[in-house]
């Protein structure tokens, strides 16, 4: 996993717990999960662009 061993992962998790605290960790995790879910949803949606020319009835020509 990205060239990280178990020691590095545990060290990163320890630093995260020190920064955010144990009580805020569930909030941070759920917010991160929602952000990832929204990103996946937005990237998987097909982007359809309407390229048909619009007929402008009030056109001065």
From Swiss-Prot:
One of its GO terms (molecular function) is protein transmembrane transporter activity. It is a single-pass membrane protein. Keywords: Cell inner membrane, Cell membrane, Membrane, Protein transport, Translocation, Transmembrane, Transmembrane helix, Transport. Its main location: membrane. It comes from the Bacteria. Pfam families: TatA_B_E (PF02416). InterPro entries: TatA/B/E, TatA/E. It is found in: Cell inner membrane. The chain crosses the membrane at residues 1-21. The keyword Cell inner membrane applies. One of its GO terms (cellular component) is TAT protein transport complex. GO terms for biological process: protein transport by the Tat complex. Belongs to the TatA/E family. Part of the twin-arginine translocation (Tat) system that transports large folded proteins containing a characteristic twin-arginine motif in their signal peptide across membranes. TatA could form the protein-conducting channel of the Tat system. The Tat system comprises two distinct complexes: a TatABC complex, containing multiple copies of TatA, TatB and TatC subunits, and a separate TatA complex, containing only TatA subunits. Substrates initially bind to the TatABC complex, which probably triggers association of the separate TatA complex to form the active translocon. HAMAP family: TatA_E (MF_00236). This is Sec-independent protein translocase protein TatA.
């Amino acid at each position: 996993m990205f060239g990280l061993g178990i020691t590095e992962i545990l060290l990163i998790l320890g630093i995260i717990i020190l920064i955010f605290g144990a009580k805020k960790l569930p909030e941070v995790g759920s917010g991160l999960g929602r952000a990832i879910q929204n990103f996946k949803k937005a990237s998987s949606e097909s982007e359809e662009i309407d390229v048909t020319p619009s007929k402008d009835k009030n056109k001065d020509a």
